[in-house]
Design a protein with these regions (language model features):
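N-terminal amphipathic/basic-hydrophobic helices that include classical n-h-c signal peptides
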Residues: 1-15
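N-terminal intrinsically disordered, cationic/polar leader segments
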Residues: 12, 16-157
Length: 157
């Protein structure tokens, strides 16, 4: 008899053949995409966040790398905290990102319900809007959850 209560309930008893038990158990425990709503998918994408300020760039043809090891947000599905490191690389054109405002911007994610993928893409979108770089790349390396380690990367252009 399976140990998981949903599997036992779905089988309706112990008289089911072993081959059928496996199939019913898989179906009983299957996570469907119906459990993730459009609201989950869009969570945090249009949230009001602090403005990222800039200052006038004086040089051309160099790269800036900023590593932010204290990224936190909330998973919109589970409500559990997510942790990670955000790495921003860009080549400035006419403006550079002001670091204090960038720090305040990233810390605003702390209580925001947003998926990893949306966070990385939103950060890139806001960085590009703020400083109009020649190119930019945002990489999010997130702490393992359930044995899975996720790295998300978004690029401009």
């Amino acid at each position: 008899m399976p140990r998981h209560p949903l599997a036992r309930e779905a089988m309706g008893g112990a008289s089911v053949k072993r081959k059928e038990k496996r199939a019913v158990t898989r179906d009983a425990l299957r996570v469907t995409s119906d459990e993730y709503t459009e609201a989950h998918a869009k969570s945090g994408v249009t949230a009001d966040l602090p403005e990222i300020e800039t200052w006038p760039n004086q040089y051309k043809g160099y790269e800036i790398t900023i590593e932010i090891p204290e990224y936190t947000a909330i998973c919109p599905k589970t409500g559990l905290p997510d942790f990670g490191t955000i790495r921003l690389r860009y080549m400035p054109d006419k403006a550079c990102l002001e670091l204090k405002s960038l720090k305040l911007y990233i810390h605003a994610y702390r209580n925001l319900g947003i998926f990893y993928e949306n966070a990385v893409n939103r950060i890139l979108q806001d960085v590009v809007a703020a400083c109009r770089p020649v190119w930019a790349r945002v990489t999010g390396e997130f702490t393992a959850r359930g044995g899975l380690h996720s790295t998300i990367e978004a690029k401009y252009p």
